[in-house]
Amino acid sequence: MIAKSRVKVYRYDPDRDSTYRFDTFDVPVTEGMTVLDALNYIYENHDSSLAYRWNCRAGQCGSCTVVVNGKPAAACRSQMPRDGEVSIAPLLQFPVIKDLVVDLRPGISRLERTRPYIQRGKTPERPEKLLQGDIEPMKELRKCLECWGCISACPVVAEAWYEFSGPTMMTKLARLALDRRDIEERVKMAFTDGLYSCTTCKTCVEVCPKSIDIPGKAIEKLRVYAVKTGLGPLEGQMAFLNSIANTGKSVDRTSTPLLETVPERVEVPNPVDRVAFFTGCLMDYRLQNTGRSIINTLRRNAVEVLVPKNQSCCGSPAFRTGMTDLAEKQAERNVKIFESLGVDKVIVGCAGCGLTLRTNFEETMRRARGEGLRFKVYDFTEYL
C-alpha cells in the first residue's frame, strides 16, 4: 500500500483574496520523494493554479526555497515524510506575489547596493595569478546560492531589516573583503549595514543548503577587519572587553564568586571519571547556585571534579566583536591551565562558553602550535 502524506500549502492571491489560507492535499509518497515532487503532484493532479518557483531540481539554484514545517529549505532537497504532515509556506520578509512565489526585490535591491562583484583599480595583467592561499579564505563563502533562506530565518532581520542588511549581504561583503583583487571599502559597507547587529545565533547556518558558517566565516571575519580599521567594537561593547582585559571577567563582581566557595578538587570515593569544570563568568559571578548544582550532581554520580581557581573568561565577547588579540590571549591562558590538570574532559554549564571552547579555542591552538585541544569539551547535560 502506498503511503500518503497530508500537505498543507499556503495559498494567497492578492488580486482575489483578502487574506491567506492553507489548502490541504493528500499526496502519495514514494521512496526518495521531495517536497518539490509533492508540489508538482499537487499542481498536476489537484490544482493547476498553484504558483511556486523551481528550476534546477539539484539544489544548486536556490529558486525553490520555501518554508517547510517552519524552516526555510530547498523544496528539491527536502524529503517527504511517509504517513506524515507537511506544511509549506512562502519565505518570510518578502511580499507574496501569489501562493509560494515571493517578490525578491527587497533583498535584491539591498544586494545591488553592495555592488557584489570585484571592483578593480586597473585592468589586471593576463593571465591573472591567484594562489591557493588567496582563494581558501573565501572558498566557503562562494558557495552561497542566494536562496534567501537565511534572510527568511534571521531573527534580527525579522525585527530590524532596516538596520541589519542580513546574512546574504554579509556573506557577499566578506567574500569581497577577503579577495585581494577588490579595492572597494567592503568593511565600511558592512559596518554601515549593521555588521554588529548580528547576534551570531547561527540560525542562518541551520537553514543554509550549503551549511555556510556565516557568523564564523563572514560576520566575525568582517568584525576583525572593523577593529583593525578603527570602526569597531561598538562603544557599548567596550565595558565588557575592558573588564576582561583588566579583571579576567566580563562582568562585575556583585557577590562572593563561586570559585571562592568551592574546593579546587572535589573528591569522591572510587571515582568513575575525573573531569575539570570551566565555570565561565556568569557561573562564577552571577549563577553560583547553578554552578554548585553542577558540581554536586557530578559528585553524586561518582565523578571527581577539578575546579581550577585561576581560570578566567573564555573570551567569547572578544571573539564575537573582532578583538582577536584579547580573545586569543584568553584562550591560550585557559588552555594552559586546563591542560596542566591532566584531564581529557572539560565540563561547561554555559552554552556560549561551550561553543567558544569547542570552536575558537580549537582554532586558536591549531594556529598557535599546530595542534588542537588536548581535552574534549562537554556540555554538562551532554556529559551526563
Regions of interest found by a model, annotated:
Residues R53-G59, V348:
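Active-site nucleophile and cofactor-binding loops and adjacent substrate-binding regions
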Residues R82-V86:
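A short, basic-hydrophobic beta/loop patch
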Residues M33-S48, A89-G248, L326-R333, R369-L373, ...:
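Ferredoxin-type iron-sulfur electron-transfer modules in oxidoreductases and energy-metabolism complexes
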Residues E146, L178-S312, S316-M365, R369-G372:
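Iron-sulfur-cluster electron-transfer modules
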Residues T30-A38, Q79, P257:
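Short, structural beta-strand-to-alpha-helix junction motif
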Residues I2-F25:
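Eukaryote-biased recognition of intrinsically disordered, low-complexity regulatory segments
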Residues V67-G70:
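Short strand-turn-strand beta-turns centered on an Asx-Gly dipeptide
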